[in-house]
């Protein structure tokens, strides 16, 4: 199996290169379960963020990073946009999303109670990797629909052309193949 050697936050990871289509492969970066990488990268991202009231992420891979950044910033909670409607959700708001790593169109949902918490607040959108930006754009639409003010968008890695974006915070670039 081909791999890509990633260096980030003083750590090294061998990422398997995964074929997504006939002309696109990516280095698969998964932070779920990697406590060390979350622990090292979260403070670096937190330092780059402006003042925020809430951290918002989409399930699932951004959750540990959102938790750790929230903890570092002394925020009492963070918000997770879900990929399906849960029984506890009352009047959820929703947007559609198309992601490079997901074959079918998906939706993101925000519980009405969470939407009310972030209304009029400064939020930072957090993810593990920003690639085409479609997931991030959907998350931004969702929180803006809730009335929040997006003041930052951040990830550990910017994949492919995302590295050239000026509107995101990231620690390292990740090539596509």
Q: PLM features: residue spans?
A:
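PRPP-dependent phosphoribosyltransferase catalytic core
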Residues: 4-5, 137-177
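Short Gly/Thr/Asp-enriched flexible loops that form oxyanion-binding sites at enzyme active sites
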Residues: 65-73, 140
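Gly/Ser/Thr-rich loops at beta-strand to alpha-helix junctions
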Residues: 59-65, 132
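Short, hinge-like loop/turn segments at secondary-structure boundaries
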Residues: 73-74, 95-100, 169-172
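Conserved acidic residues
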Residues: 53, 121, 151
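Short, glycine/charge-rich flexible loops or terminal/linker lids adjacent to PRPP-binding catalytic cores
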Residues: 78-123
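Short glycine-rich phosphate-binding loop at a beta-alpha junction
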Residues: 52-59
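Active-site-facing substrate-recognition patch
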Residues: 1-52
């Amino acid at each position: 199996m081909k791999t890509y050697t990633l260096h980030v936050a003083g750590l090294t990871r061998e990422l398997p290169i995964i074929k997504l289509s006939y002309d696109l492969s990516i280095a698969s970066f998964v932070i779920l379960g990697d406590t060390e990488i979350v622990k090292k990268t979260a403070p670096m991202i937190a330092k780059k963020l402006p003042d925020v009231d809430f951290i918002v992420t989409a399930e699932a891979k951004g959750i540990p990073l959102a938790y750790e950044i929230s903890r570092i910033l002394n925020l009492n909670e963070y918000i997770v946009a879900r990929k399906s409607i849960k029984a506890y959700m009352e009047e959820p708001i929703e947007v559609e999303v198309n992601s490079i790593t997901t074959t079918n169109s998906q939706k993101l949902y925000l519980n009405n109670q969470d939407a009310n918490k972030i209304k009029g607040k400064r939020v930072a959108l957090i993810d593990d990797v920003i690639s085409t930006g479609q997931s991030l754009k959907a998350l931004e639409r969702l929180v803006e629909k809730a009335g929040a003010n997006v003041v930052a968008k951040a990830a550990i890695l910017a994949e492919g052309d995302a590295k050239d974006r000026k509107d995101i915070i990231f620690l390292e670039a990740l090539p596509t193949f």
